[in-house]
Amino acid sequence: MTRSLTAIIERDGDGYVSLCPELDVASQGDSVEQARANLREALELFFEAASSEEVSRRLSGEVFVTQVEVTCG
């Protein structure tokens, strides 16, 4: 079974941090591609190790990624 999840990747110093907000699972890498691949691996390990109750408890149904315009200064 496969599932589509959100991956948010942002630069952090010399590398990148990746986050899956639906499950609150994170990883990192030296490049965007590596951070994405490492997040995929972390998610696969989570699904292998977590009970169905843990998955249900942590899995949020809806995640919205959007931009917000704010006044600065």
Predicted regions located by residue number:
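A short, exposed loop/beta-hairpin motif centered on an aromatic-Gly-Thr core
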Residues: 23-32
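Short, charged, surface-exposed hinge/linker loops at domain edges
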Residues: 1-8, 33, 37-73
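Short aromatic-glycine-(Arg/Gly/Cys) micro-motifs in beta-strand/loop hairpins
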Residues: 8-22
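Compositionally biased, intrinsically disordered low-complexity regions
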Residues: 15-17, 31, 63
